């Protein structure tokens, strides 16, 4: 792992001691720091009111809170998530990282009786570039969903939020996100809140001023798909206590509130999931992503499908498929996927990446991957030569490989 260029995700449940009420919570690493952190335990550790009301509760974590009420016992907690699928399996020390990794998790949120899944992935696009994929689906078991709130916290001093095309969202001060809405008191720990009601795709940029270090400011770039009946917020949250004791941080963590982005989906968030791309970058190592757009599966019956197109500045184009049911098939512009997750890239500079996650079929221009049983298959072209990793036998009668392939 390269300390500056590698990417890493931490996904947290609530099974065992010293646990928080956080659902499926994640942390993101980038450019040498935990950029998207867990909040920690507060100024007065486990005995403090701030721990009981905020630091141990959903809104302090990078997760989704349902109807403003998601919670359950903390410290000793028995609310784990289920691992539905992942790639790769736990590796032996020293093994190289694959260019695509992912996990698909399920969680039952007990307070609201909601079903939640979170599919997260790392896609490496070059020796020093890559991005995170996040698809979070959430809905109440018996309907009647009021709203689902997606929280993301990031280090830094400034946060900008615009439409994905750069246009102004006209954010306005708001008193939403508060205990007064019959929500958790943790909401009232947020302040300097601004909101825009919009169905547009949005782009958030979190900036860490590195003037006291090397002057190479660090950014976390966040793209999120827009949906009807959605609001987006910027806010400030209490400081990130969990990193305040870490040496060599870029600024005094205890003196800086935590930059917070919130997306509120009114109604259910299963057929209108939170679909995001995250990419760390710096002033000297700018974003490698040219654009992020989204697509729907062709045909009917896949209302909860998520499709993402990520265009990189090096000419690579990734089409990302996320399905809630691996038994279903999604098609788009000649591509076909029957899986939880898939990444299909174009061919650029003699390179190409095709990934099938917990699936049985992937069809892309010039290539077909098929297995009898659900499998993870990574097929890559590197400098003109093909390589494959598979968790199960692949039917080569349906897999077109050039004669210069290596299997």
Where are these regions (language model features)?
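Catalytic and substrate-binding regions of extracellular carbohydrate-active enzymes
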Residues: 1-173, 182, 268-270, 276-283, ...
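Short, surface-exposed beta-strand/loop "edge" segments at domain boundaries and coil↔beta transitions
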Residues: 2-6, 108-117, 143-147, 210-220, ...
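Ser/Thr- (and often Asn-) enriched beta-sheet segments in non-cytosolic proteins
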Residues: 101, 160, 201-209, 217-223, ...
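Extended, compositionally biased non-globular segments
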Residues: 131, 244-264
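Polysaccharide-binding surfaces and accessory modules of carbohydrate-active proteins
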Residues: 151-227
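N-terminal compositionally biased, intrinsically disordered segments and leader/signal-like regions
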Residues: 199, 208, 235, 241, ...
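Extended amphipathic secondary-structure runs
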Residues: 204-237, 259-282, 406-407
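Non-catalytic terminal regions with compositionally biased, polar/charged low complexity
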Residues: 261-272, 278-399, 406
């Amino acid at each position: 792992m390269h300390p500056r260029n590698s990417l890493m995700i931490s996904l947290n449940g609530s099974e065992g001691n010293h646990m928080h009420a956080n659902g499926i919570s994640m942390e993101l690493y980038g450019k040498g720091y935990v950029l998207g952190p867990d909040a920690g335990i507060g100024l007065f550790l486990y005995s403090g009111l701030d721990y009981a009301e905020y630091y141990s509760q959903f809104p302090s974590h990078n997760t989704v809170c349902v109807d403003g009420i998601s919670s359950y016992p903390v410290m000793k907690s028995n609310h784990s998530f289920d691992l539905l699928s992942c790639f790769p399996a736990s590796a032996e020390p020293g093994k190289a990282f694959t260019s695509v990794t992912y996990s698909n998790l399920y969680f039952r949120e007990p307070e609201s009786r909601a079903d939640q899944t979170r599919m997260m992935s790392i896609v490496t696009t070059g020796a020093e570039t890559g991005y995170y994929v996040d698809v979070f689906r959430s809905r109440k078991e018996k309907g009647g969903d009021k709203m689902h709130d997606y929280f993301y916290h990031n280090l830094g001093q400034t946060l900008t939020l615009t439409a994905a095309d750069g246009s102004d969202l006209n954010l306005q001060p708001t008193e939403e996100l508060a205990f007064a809405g019959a929500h958790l008191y943790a909401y009232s720990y947020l302040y300097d809140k601004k909101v825009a009601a919009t169905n547009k795709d949005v782009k958030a940029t979190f900036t860490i001023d590195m003037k006291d270090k090397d002057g190479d400011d660090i950014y976390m770039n966040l793209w999120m798909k827009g949906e009807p009946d959605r609001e987006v917020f910027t806010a400030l949250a209490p400081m990130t206590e969990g990193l305040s004791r870490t040496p060599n941080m870029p600024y005094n963590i205890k003196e800086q509130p935590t930059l917070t982005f919130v997306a509120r989906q009114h109604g259910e968030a299963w057929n209108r999931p939170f679909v995001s791309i995250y990419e760390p970058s710096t002033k000297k190592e700018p974003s490698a992503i040219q654009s992020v757009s989204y697509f729907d599966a062709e045909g009917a019956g896949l209302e909860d499908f998520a499709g993402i197109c990520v265009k990189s500045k090096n000419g690579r184009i990734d089409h990302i498929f996320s399905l809630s049911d691996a038994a279903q098939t999604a098609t788009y512009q000649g591509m076909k996927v029957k899986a939880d997750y898939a990444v299909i890239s174009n061919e650029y500079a003699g390179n190409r990446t095709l990934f099938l996650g917990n699936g049985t079929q992937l069809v892309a221009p010039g290539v077909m991957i098929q297995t009898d049983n659900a499998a993870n298959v990574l097929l890559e072209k590197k400098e003109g030569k093909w390589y494959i990793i598979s968790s199960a036998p692949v039917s080569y009668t349906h897999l077109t490989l050039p004669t210069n392939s290596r299997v």
